[in-house]
């Protein structure tokens, strides 16, 4: 690892060093540059480059593992909301590293799993697109009803169809989470940030990003469909349906609703 942090090339792993990006899992292996091309960027990440005799894929999986992530998160210093990883702490970590053959064997197994996850994600995305198309056709474009709202329907407000559970949210700092067993997912605004040994919710819920990264590039809200036992910090709205509206229906509704016009804030979007 080196702290200059603004240059990278194919094979390097880049890890966010500022909160909440690191907790949100912002780490990637670079593979989009041309041969010999060098990338430049922000100083808000750390670049990891495999030394000779080490496997770049193994380095990536090592950096994304708790072995590196957890000490990095615990080392964060700075004002609230702008805390950064201390690169010297990361550089000083002692880790067990197998020989090159062992590294390649480990990385190969993990890559196969990643490829399967990516394939499943594509299937899910395709199914979601089909569901969105059906929902839009019936409830937005009203095609089955010749474009007219049926007489027994009415225009209402979101409050008529959702229950908000935000009052039950309890944020846990990275230091508080560091010593907890990794059992239940701990959600942030956009993704699983960590795992903890306790939970606040049990069931099927819709999480809608409240601040930070709240919309995608087209202005649609960042949503997470979650099921089971989990914990949520205070950066996501926690939603269930009422009056006959399921969480699945709400997901489709919000995923097709552009909210850019109601997003506020210059630096911290909300």
Regions from the PLM with identified roles:
Residues 1-6, 17-24, 154-200, 211-212:
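Low-complexity, Lys/Gly-biased intrinsically disordered segments
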Residues 9, 13, 54, 58, ...:
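Generic recognition of stable, solvent-exposed alpha-helical segments in well-folded globular domains
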Residues 74-76, 172-179, 265-269:
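Short coil/turn segments at secondary-structure boundaries
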Residues 81-82:
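Extended, charge-rich, solvent-exposed interface segments
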Residues 96, 100-171, 176-188:
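Non-catalytic DNA-recognition/assembly elements of restriction-modification systems
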């Amino acid at each position: 690892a080196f702290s200059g942090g603004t240059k990278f090339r194919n094979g390097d792993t880049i890890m966010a060093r500022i909160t909440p990006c690191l907790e949100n899992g912002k780490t990637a292996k670079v593979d989009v540059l041309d041969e010999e091309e060098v990338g430049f960027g922000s100083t808000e990440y750390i670049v990891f480059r495999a030394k000779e005799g080490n496997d770049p894929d193994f380095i990536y999986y090592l950096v994304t593992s708790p072995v590196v992530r957890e000490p990095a998160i615990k080392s964060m210093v700075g004002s609230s909301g702008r805390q950064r990883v201390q690169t010297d702490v990361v550089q000083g970590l002692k880790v067990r590293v197998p020989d090159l053959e062992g590294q390649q064997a480990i990385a190969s197994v993990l890559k196969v799993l990643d490829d399967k996850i990516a394939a499943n994600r594509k299937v899910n995305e395709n199914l979601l697109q089909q569901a969105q198309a059906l929902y839009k056709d019936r409830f937005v474009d009203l095609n089955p009803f010749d474009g007219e709202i049926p007489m027994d329907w009415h225009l209402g407000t979101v409050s008529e169809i959702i229950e908000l559970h935000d009052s039950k949210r309890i944020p846990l700092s990275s230091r508080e989470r560091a010593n907890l067993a990794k059992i239940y997912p701990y959600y942030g605004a956009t993704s699983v940030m960590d795992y903890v040994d306790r939970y606040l919710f049990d069931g099927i819920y819709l999480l809608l990003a409240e601040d930070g990264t709240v919309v995608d590039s087209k202005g649609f809200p960042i949503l997470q469909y979650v099921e089971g036992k989990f914990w949520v910090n205070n950066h996501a709205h926690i939603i269930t349906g009422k009056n006959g509206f399921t969480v699945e229906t709400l997901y489709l509704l919000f995923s097709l609703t552009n909210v850019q016009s109601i997003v506020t804030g210059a630096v911290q979007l909300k």
